[in-house]
Amino acid sequence: MSRYTGSLWKVSRRLNYSVSETGKELHKRAYGPGQHGQKKVKLSDYGFQLQEKQKLRFTYGVSEKQFRKTFDNASKLKGIHGEMFLVLLESRLDNVVYRLGFAKTRAQARQLVNHGHILVDGKKVDIASYRLKPGQTVTLREKSKNLNIVQEALNSKFVRADYVSLDKELVGKYVRYPQRNEFLPDINEQLIVEYYNR
């Protein structure tokens, strides 16, 4: 399954969850899109598991193949499988670019990475799924600092996560792996583990 390129607002309304983490999608209509969007549908256990998986997958904007591969990689790490899965997703380069505030959305962050605007430890990395380790630095190429999407993001109101830092010279750092209580509080990763282990 390829990466979804349609309206994330419709996805958010269908899932009743803000995949952009802003909540804006649900302000106007907090129900699904379409003629029957307001009808309540009773979900089975499988339905709840699938819905939770979709909420997380659309939040990070990854394909099903990448999502499953990351899930399988998490099973090889020490720790609780579901939590390690979330940590791996949170450690993606495109996500850290977003968490640093270089982009207003993960889609914009992915574009910055793919187009070669991002340096990791001083070297260009154009792979959005590149997994960062604590201590690595993330910066913009000098000529990329003046891009409109970068300037708009840097000038917007933004609460930076505690596990990343950014100095006045726009040198970002992935300080440490995040604790589970620091991000995505409305995601129940255990349901996703159950979905893939069914």
Curated annotation (Swiss-Prot):
It holds the Pfam family S4. SMART domains: Ribosomal_S4, S4. CDD domains: S4 (cd00165). GO terms for biological process: ribosomal small subunit biogenesis; translation. The keyword Transmembrane does not apply. InterPro entries: Ribosomal_uS4, Ribosomal_uS4_bac-type, Ribosomal_uS4_CS, Ribosomal_uS4_N, S4_RNA-bd, S4_RNA-bd_sf. Gene3D superfamilies: Ribosomal Protein S4 Delta 41, Chain A, domain 1 (1.10.1050.10), RNA-binding S4 domain (3.10.290.10). GO terms for molecular function: rRNA binding; structural constituent of ribosome. Residues 91-154 form the S4 RNA-binding domain. GO terms for cellular component: small ribosomal subunit. The keyword RNA-binding applies. Keywords: Ribonucleoprotein, Ribosomal protein, RNA-binding, rRNA-binding. Part of the 30S ribosomal subunit. Contacts protein S5. The interaction surface between S4 and S5 is involved in control of translational fidelity. One of the primary rRNA binding proteins, it binds directly to 16S rRNA where it nucleates assembly of the body of the 30S subunit. With S5 and S12 plays an important role in translational accuracy. NCBIfam families: PRK05327.1 (NF003717), rpsD_bact (TIGR01017). Belongs to the universal ribosomal protein uS4 family. This is Small ribosomal subunit protein uS4. It comes from Aster yellows witches'-broom phytoplasma (strain AYWB).
